[in-house]
Each structure stands twice: as C-alpha cells, then as structure tokens.
C-alpha cells in the first residue's frame, strides 16, 4: 500500500484521529492533496461496492408546519473512501465536504464514530 513512516497530515478537525495505516491515494485528506472544507456530517455507510466510493445515509426529522408534526426523512450522499480507513457497510462514519472528486462525489470519509 504505502511506505512505512509516511507523513500524515493533521486535517484540522477536532475529534478525528489520523489512521494508523498509510495509502497512496491522491484524494486522501491524510496522505494526499485533498483539503476538507465546509460542513461535517455523520451517517451510516450503506453501500461500499465500487472502488473507493460509497453511499452514506442520514436520517433526520423535518417539521411540517401545516400539520404541526415531524416526519422522518433521509438523504443519501455519495462519498469517497480512502483505502487507509478500515470501514465496512453498516458502520457509522464521519464525512466532510471537499472539492468535487467526481460528478456526484463531493464528500470524503474522515473517520468512524
């Protein structure tokens, strides 16, 4: 995968520890050139079949003013998964916004919860 003792960057987000493994991925926020910016979200990884790409699902409540009740909603976000992170389907992950990596991928996984 990567060289032993490779440089690990501090991405500047509190509560996120850098991974112990290294990787050669250019789009890794810890070992590559990808910078994280914008919002930080939490969700459940529901699909991890494509190479280095997955889908994170977030459940949230939406207030309907007409009926004065909350309804459950969910959103699915396409994410890039660096190979240095050990995540699998069903894990709760922390994702951060970054520049567009692909047509529909603008978030990257930065850790497990």
From Swiss-Prot:
A GO term, aspect molecular function: structural constituent of ribosome
Any single Gene Ontology cellular-component annotation: cytosolic small ribosomal subunit
Presence of the UniProt keyword Ribosomal protein in the record: yes
Signal peptide residues on this chain, from the entry's feature table: none
Cystine pairs: none
Gene Ontology biological process terms from the UniProt entry: translation
Keyword annotations of the record: Ribonucleoprotein, Ribosomal protein, RNA-binding, rRNA-binding
Purpose: One of the primary rRNA binding proteins, it binds specifically to the 5'-end of 16S ribosomal RNA.
Subunit structure: Part of the 30S ribosomal subunit.
Family label: Belongs to the universal ribosomal protein uS17 family.
Protein name as annotated: Small ribosomal subunit protein uS17
The species this protein was found in: Sulfurisphaera tokodaii (strain DSM 16993 / JCM 10545 / NBRC 100140 / 7) (Sulfolobus tokodaii)
Gene name linked to the record: rps17
